[in-house]
């Protein structure tokens, strides 16, 4: 019997170097039954919702918008330096301790409210939805426009900063002329605290791609708007940037407008006419074909909130099942459903308004402020890392600082006596070498986060926290029983007759 086979000229060989094997943390990490609870203080922030105002040539406050990313960098204590009541928890010679996050609750204060944004010189020519006739453009058709931004609620939990994506101006292959549209490319950067999320106008570098400074609201017109790169973080082989996430977005278009100015990409026409429209006699040039929609986040409701409720991590989406390497955790959050802007009015001359004074608009100054209130609570589980050659090599390839912080290096004792200057930075001594002033470098020193120190806020008293009681109920455990209060019993005399008294004979 004969069979037809395809051309066998191609021969597939395995790669010359072995493929890197990515381990799952459950393969070399053992979980214990020891849990800790930690929580932050009440975290408050006040600022201007649109920009950083100047007062006497100084920045009086920061920009604070409900559509900004809040990136919390939570720093935990080193569990390898803990003093445990028993010595059989782990073997320091063959094992190391690490934290694993098992539960988290992100709480928001302040009432629900819709934030507004806008621009006093917004490029909105005319409504394009219900237009009776075309109007002629003028030199300046910008108007004052206000709108409510896209409604966003999301948070991402991981042990490294969250990855973001945005579109930015790219390098052109050929020299461009004035007025040509620049090429754009997708860039991936880390999301920092205070950066803007998408408000309905897209994720791009508005500072570089909006030369008119009138095509976006004030809070993003000079900013880089980012969006979390869920595709990249979901395919991360180590799974450190995103253990899990929760997201809720909502938006609809309220108005349809057209841009004023010259259209960069004209509607194509040919010798036989245009396939897109039929020309008319006596009609002027076509109106603008650059259309935009004004976003609106619509109704905010407490029925669709992802905050102020606990989340339990039974299985992470990546290979890292909640292990907080280097004793830190990053929480990236956005909540535009509490975006109310405070309007504060102050009299220009008098500290207090007189009762008999009449209202005059020029006598009052008006200010805008936005406030935020956060509170984070976590349940941490103590885990043991077995120091096998495979696990050490895997962690070293992922992040060598993990091994350095565990002090696993073998240092040979010096044979010769060494010199140590007391004041090495003094001008009377030699210039200090790099080894003399060696300081541990922060890998995220150029990034901006909201640092929260929790090194002294871990507790094993689990009865005092509602989050822990909910967690213990989920896993089928009970908290430590409290001693029963002392009870006092009283004899019930109801229904009993009083004893008769004997009469004495006189």
From Swiss-Prot:
GO molecular function: structural molecule activity
Cellular component terms per the entry's GO annotation: host cell nucleus; T=7 icosahedral viral capsid
Disulfide bond keyword on record: yes
Biological processes, Gene Ontology terms: endocytosis involved in viral entry into host cell; virion attachment to host cell
Compartments in which it is found: Virion; Host nucleus
Keyword Transport annotated: no
Keywords noted in UniProt: Capsid protein, Disulfide bond, Host nucleus, Host-virus interaction, Late protein, T=7 icosahedral capsid protein, Viral attachment to host cell, Viral penetration into host cytoplasm, Virion, Virus endocytosis by host, Virus entry into host cell
Pfam entry (one): Late_protein_L1
Segments for region (Disordered): 484-506
Entry function: Forms an icosahedral capsid with a T=7 symmetry and a 50 nm diameter. The capsid is composed of 72 pentamers linked to each other by disulfide bonds and associated with L2 proteins. Binds to heparan sulfate proteoglycans on cell surface of basal layer keratinocytes to provide initial virion attachment. This binding mediates a conformational change in the virus capsid that facilitates efficient infection. The virion enters the host cell via endocytosis. During virus trafficking, L1 protein dissociates from the viral DNA and the genomic DNA is released to the host nucleus.
Family to which this protein belongs: Belongs to the papillomaviridae L1 protein family.
Assembly: Self-assembles into homopentamers. The capsid has an icosahedral symmetry and consists of 72 capsomers, with each capsomer being a pentamer of L1. Interacts with the minor capsid protein L2; this interaction is necessary for viral genome encapsidation. Interacts with protein E2; this interaction enhances E2-dependent replication and transcription activation.
Listed name of the protein: Major capsid protein L1
Gene symbol of the encoding locus: L1
